[in-house]
Amino acid sequence: LRQVQAMSATTSAAEPLLRVLRTACRLPLLAWHLLVHLPVTLLLIAIDTVGGKRVGHLAIRWWARGLLWVFGMRVRRIGTPLPGGTMFVANHLGWIDIVALHSQHMMGLIAKAEIRGWPLIGWLAKAGESIFLQRGNAHSLADVMAEMSQRLRAGHAVGVFPEAGTRDGRELGPFHARIFTAAVEADAPVQ
């Protein structure tokens, strides 16, 4: 028992130092990822298609996977994303959800309109084919629904967070069921 307590005390005393060391290692990796990999990704997004392949989509997936790696995160995927016009549904705990989803499959996510004006993040959201929604505006919602249906019919994936906001992960919030109408109208699968 004393040995276990001593190990526990040593581990907890070493934890702040380990955290500092992890951060010291990750900061240069993050800087490299933002200063080198991001411009390469943006260039590939601008090129978009090479030989019929969507290199922009591949670049976004590559960049998202790299960012997760820099932060020491791993995604455990169960199953395979359906190809083509599929509506992907996920809980929304924070910004990392977007990166995790894009690391697995390219999709245009529904985002609040304010994000469009954010420095760098807004541009990345546009490059990631986000569909912007002005919250509380019925006309904007109708436009978003029409855009989602059109993209799904055209064979492009769309991602939604039906709780329409972030949660702490302990409980589900109410779903905005109307968002699923786009998949029904487009006769698209939901995953």
For each of these PLM feature ranges, what is it?
Residues W69-Q191:
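Soluble catalytic domains of membrane acyltransferases
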Residues L1-A6:
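Short, Lys/Arg-enriched N-terminal segments with co-localized hydrophobic residues
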Residues A9-R76, W123-G128:
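A transmembrane-helix-recognition feature enriched in membrane-embedded lipid enzymes
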